[in-house]
Amino acid sequence: MKLAFLFPGQGAQAVGMGQALAERFPAARHVFETADRALGYRLSDLCWKGPIEELRKTVHTQPALLTHSVAAWKLLDAAGVKPSWVAGHSLGEYSACVAAGALDFEDAVRLVHRRGELMYRAGLDRPGTMAAILGLERTQVEEACARAEGAGVVCPANLNGPGQVVISGERAAVVRACELARGMGAKRVIPLEVSGAFHSPLMGSAAAGLTEALAAVSVHDALIPVVANVSAEPLRRGVEIRAALEAQLLGAVRWEDSMRRLIADGAQGFVEVGTGTVLRGLLRTLDKSVPSWSVDDPDGLQATVSALAGAAGGVPLTGDSEPMEEAG
């Protein structure tokens, strides 16, 4: 079975994330310990003990989600469950790049920590907000944003699936676009609790800083295609992946297009790797017939490996194999 691995972005974080995997599997615990050393503080304690108010800060949320995803991916890889493609939603694109061999994990965890700092500062420099609009076509949301531009900057930021688009921009313009969306028949309009107008021009200073941070690390040619947020195109060359990551903070996450591209290219199953099941839910709005699994904890790992190890030519998940042995 040809698999695509999907890696979640911000919003999925929760106290306890990754703890069960790390307690049971030394390979997962090693990933968290590596992140702690790379960052110079106990990210693992924050993930497992909270408080949630600290974990929700984007400077912590981003490395936390990346670390949980990479820990779960390492266990899948050791069990022989391997993807033909990877994709990640916003921050999750960095996790996808690690799984594809385009980024080294220690570089990636420091990068997303820096990305969080830059995004937070950009939100202070140019305050903004975001909102989810449910029940309208993408073109209708684009029209609402265009009509609201007299109130300021506003644009589609996350094209998540049929009838689900997140907009981003200056507060007055977002409020106006939401009013227009309601008038067009939107089923729901949900203001989001965020520290800035992510994936919009208001992130300009963050994008510039991120370009500098990316210039300091190696972005390798990928071993498997990474489907980029900004283009929904599969990328392999390191120079293309670097450019896509640089463009991502200012551009929309074309998630629906990315999933449709993966299905069209032959993906027969999807595995959400890391915290939560949001991406599986979005996938079901596109195509309920495509099988999917999620690996958040040991139960999800066991179920996924049991279902896929044979199809992927892998080995069963047991406590006897060295990469997967359980901690005492």
Model-derived regions: residue spans:
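Alpha/beta catalytic cores of group-transfer enzymes, especially the acyltransferase/condensing modules
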Residues: 10-12, 39-41, 100-252
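Long, low-complexity, intrinsically disordered segments
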Residues: 318-328
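Post-His helix in hydrolase/transferase enzymes
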Residues: 307-309
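FabD-like malonyl-/acyl-CoA
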Residues: 1-141, 188, 192, 269-303, ...
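A short, acidic, amphipathic alpha-helical segment used as a generic capping/interface helix at domain edges
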Residues: 251-267
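Non-catalytic positions within long, well-ordered alpha-helices that form the structural scaffold/packing
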Residues: 77, 182, 263-266
